[in-house]
Amino acid sequence: MQTLTQHLTSQAVNDSLSHLILTLADTSKAISHAVRHGALAGVLGATEQENVQGETQKKLDIITNDMLKDALKADGTVRGLASEEEDHVVEVRQNGQYLVCFDPLDGSSNIDINSLVGTIFSILPAPAGELTETSFLQSGRAQLAAGYVLYGPSTMLALTTGQGVQLFTLDPETNEFLLTNAAMSISPETQEFAINMSNQRFWEAPMQTYIADLLLGKIGPREKSFNMRWIAAMVGDVHRVLSRGGIFTYPSDNKDPKKPYKLRLMYEANPMAFLVEQAGGKASTGYETILDITPTHIHQRVAVILGSANEVDACLSYHGIDSHK
């Protein structure tokens, strides 16, 4: 099996980008160790702090954020970083080539119940000149690489550099990421969907109708039965989609009119959309393709519908969108 280093060389990824990807991968090994030692190390539970989104921070949110910040500051290629846990962008070094956006511990509310969590990252080119928040406001099409690390029964890294999606598994004996799937591919058809049904009464009418038709199964207009899955961690739900197809959606809702969207564009939706498109799937807000959005701020939120291409198209048709035009 190829190691991650060997794979990056075989794909002719340039040295500086390879170095940065390896830094992120190495840090994820340390995060995996911290996650597995959670209760034993006394790092489970919440703090009294909130992040910029107003969410209570878990102890491991802060620990993993600091681990990534420290590693990226030492990497030598990074111009600046943006994190879910940081109010503002962080300048790293003036001659850095890359910007890194990340969610250090996606699904951290799962940590206290020993369920799936992960790290999501996006790498962008650093524009010339002074580093400001505007430097980061590039569409998802500008991403040079993106991926996630899933901390589950095994630790897995899904990665794209624009040449398909590869899956690596951390070998606990050698502490190396080994290539275990050279070409992840999302089947266009599916009978699985993932959504937080507790928000159903708050969704827009198109999404309510779409899900209602899925639940009707064979006796409804879709004429086939669907199964629902929900892990409550985007990294886990998207991993399932990449592994066996499906549609994942976190639509807009009016539960809190000031916060109609849940997922962040820069370090959740964009990297996942890049992975999904590279694996043959589609990713949309319901009204526009995620990777085509020009961000307005680093913590911008969006609706997300992604996964098997034909099922995403079906969902979009309920929103009055003809994806074939």
Swiss-Prot record:
Endpoints of the signal sequence: none
A Gene Ontology cellular-component term: cytosol
Primary localization class, coarse: cytoplasm
One GO biological process term: fructose metabolic process
EC number from the UniProt entry: 3.1.3.11
Pathway membership: Carbohydrate biosynthesis; gluconeogenesis
InterPro entries attached to this UniProt entry: FBPase_C_dom, FBPase_class-1, FBPase_N, FBPtase
CC cofactor: Mg(2+)
Intracellular or extracellular location(s): Cytoplasm
Keyword line: Carbohydrate metabolism, Cytoplasm, Hydrolase, Magnesium, Metal-binding
SUPFAM superfamilies given in the database record: Carbohydrate phosphatase
Binding-site positions, Mg(2+) 2: 103, 106, 268
Positions with a binding annotation for substrate: 106-109, 196, 262
Positions contributing to Mg(2+) 1 binding: 84, 103, 105
Domain of life (superkingdom): Bacteria
Cofactor note text: Binds 2 magnesium ions per subunit.
Matches recorded under Pfam families: FBPase, FBPase_C
Record's catalysed reaction(s): beta-D-fructose 1,6-bisphosphate + H2O = beta-D-fructose 6-phosphate + phosphate
GO molecular function, one term: fructose 1,6-bisphosphate 1-phosphatase activity
Record's subunit section: Homotetramer.
PANTHER family membership: FRUCTOSE-1,6-BISPHOSPHATASE-RELATED (PTHR11556), SEDOHEPTULOSE-1,7-BISPHOSPHATASE, CHLOROPLASTIC (PTHR11556:SF35)
Similarity annotation: Belongs to the FBPase class 1 family.
Protein name, per record: Fructose-1,6-bisphosphatase class 1
